């Protein structure tokens, strides 16, 4: 009898344990702690360190509609990272929205969990009041009509960037015209993209719009030798500084390996001037290696920190670890490793830990993988000082900018709230760190930004802090 009673008690215990099971992990986003941190970060007028926002009259991804070229719902996805990872039906030439939606409405089913899809949802939710996960054909048509109407002039774009996304300044990389430094908006700050400069072993290598040869000839500077070429490049740097450009940007990781050898000047001079038909791939790489080291030294000379695309793209040659020799040999140059080196976020942190002239920019990371971005923020803060981490949205229109900004603020707030909840950080320090990443670190790294601030209360506050 006693044995049967013990068995019964044991069985009941198993039932109770099975019924209760392990408690599900609490979602920090449902807590007052997260709400306080998120509200604090939302109030920070952000400095966005990387955008590709064109002048309004040159907006990309417009579709042919019965009302003429227009920004459409398709345009929003086509101008985002969604289309590079997931299926997106093309907009048929001259088609109506209904024709496109009939083909495209099923495109999103296999992407529902991807960050490249989910990061856009806050834009539809907050700017248009639409739950895109459950959108109907009628709602999609209405959403499309509202998007088309919003882009009849630039008022919507400016309002979303400055008020809804709460961005005060953004650094604009004009990859469509790398040697122009015009400011299309009050909030835009020019960047000198040096990607094509480093390829210019011969004038036929470059499009006219990006050519130091064409730029020099317009200023009576002829290029016959490597010395001539470098003299024009130095003038371009000086022009960028005069136009208030605050940094350099390289996207060579899309084209080639990030391993740059310290090639002697003489070897580059021997290669210079060879036509594309004559030069070998090895010789072209030697020239680019020399130029990358030269541009790195110019970065220090002109006090233009160097943003370098690392990670996602041409993965077989884009690990930030390949830059270590260059970084170590150039301690006066301030390097900014873009995208956190995704997927090598840990390696990127190790580089920054060992080299105080390295900053990490989380630009793009939350839209590639929200979970990895949250983990990266927490790991980076454990490995390196909080004053060398930044962020950027890296998009091309209002909805993408808002979405990337909102998801970054949320991801950062979640990462910080979890650390506070675990007792690893005081809430007051979490708020300060959040502001550093969203704003203060960029102002410290790019000091010229302080005189470009246009919100009077923040400009006054920063001026007072500088005195």
Question: In which residue ranges do the predicted regions lie?
Answer:
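Active-site beta-loop-alpha junctions enriched in small/polar residues
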Residues: 52, 175, 193-199, 251-255, ...
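Mid-to-C-terminal alpha-helical segments outside catalytic/metal-binding sites
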Residues: 28-47, 56, 61, 70-127, ...
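A contiguous, mid-domain pocket- or channel-lining segment that forms the substrate-recognition surface
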Residues: 159, 165-221
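Divalent metal-coordination and catalytic microenvironments
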Residues: 50, 170, 248, 309, ...
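Alpha-helical scaffold segments that flank or form the walls of functional sites
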Residues: 42, 63-185, 226-244
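Bacterial N-terminal signal peptides
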Residues: 6-19
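Sec/Tat signal peptide C-region and signal peptidase I cleavage site
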Residues: 21-25
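Histidine/acidic residue-rich metal-binding segments in metalloenzymes
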Residues: 156-161, 224-250, 257-358, 372-390, ...
């Amino acid at each position: 009898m006693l044995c049967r009673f013990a068995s019964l008690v044991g069985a009941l215990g198993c039932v109770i344990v099975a019924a209760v099971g392990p408690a599900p992990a609490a979602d920090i986003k449902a807590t007052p702690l997260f709400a306080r941190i998120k509200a604090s970060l939302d109030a920070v007028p952000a400095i966005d360190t990387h955008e590709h926002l064109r002048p309004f009259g040159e907006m990309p991804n417009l579709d042919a509609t019965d009302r003429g070229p227009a920004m459409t719902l398709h345009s929003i996805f086509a101008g985002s990272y969604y289309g590079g990872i997931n299926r997106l039906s093309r907009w048929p030439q001259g088609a109506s929205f209904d024709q496109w939606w009939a083909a495209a409405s099923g495109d999103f089913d296999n992407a529902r969990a991807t960050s490249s899809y989910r990061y856009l949802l806050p834009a539809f939710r907050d700017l248009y009041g639409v739950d895109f996960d459950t959108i109907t054909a009628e709602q999609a048509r209405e959403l499309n009509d509202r998007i088309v109407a919003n882009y009849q002039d630039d008022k919507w774009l400016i309002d979303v960037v400055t008020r809804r996304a709460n961005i005060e300044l953004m650094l604009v990389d004009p990859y469509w015209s790398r040697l122009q430094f015009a400011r299309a908006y009050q909030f835009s700050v020019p960047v000198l993209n040096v990607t094509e400069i480093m390829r210019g072993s011969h004038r036929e290598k470059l499009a006219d719009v990006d050519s130091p040869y064409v730029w020099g000839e317009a200023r009576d500077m002829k290029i016959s030798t490597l010395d001539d070429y470098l003299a024009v490049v130095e003038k371009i740097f000086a022009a960028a500084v005069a136009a208030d450009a605050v940094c350099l940007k390289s996207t060579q990781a899309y084209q080639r390996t990030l391993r740059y050898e310290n090639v002697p000047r003489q070897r580059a001079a021997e290669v210079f001037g060879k036509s594309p038909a004559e030069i070998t791939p090895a010789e072209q790489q030697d020239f680019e290696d020399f130029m990358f080291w030269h541009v790195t030294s110019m970065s220090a000379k002109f006090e233009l920190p160097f943003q370098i695309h690392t990670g996602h793209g041409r993965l077989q040659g884009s690990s930030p670890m390949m830059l270590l020799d260059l970084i170590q040999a150039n301690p006066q140059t301030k390097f900014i490793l873009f995208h956190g080196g995704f997927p090598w976020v840990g390696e990127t942190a190790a580089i920054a830990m060992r080299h105080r002239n390295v900053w990490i920019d989380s630009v793009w990371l939350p839209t590639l993988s929200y979970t990895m971005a949250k983990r990266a923020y927490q790991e980076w803060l454990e490995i390196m000082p909080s004053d060398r981490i930044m962020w950027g949205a890296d998009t091309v229109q209002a909805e993408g900018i808002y979405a990337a900004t909102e998801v970054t603020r949320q991801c950062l707030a979640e990462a910080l709230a979890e650390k506070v909840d675990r007792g690893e950080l005081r809430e007051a320090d979490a708020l300060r760190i959040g502001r550093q990443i969203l704003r203060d670190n960029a102002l410290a790294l790019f000091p010229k930004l302080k005189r470009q601030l246009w919100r009077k209360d923040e400009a006054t506050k920063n001026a007072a802090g500088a005195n």
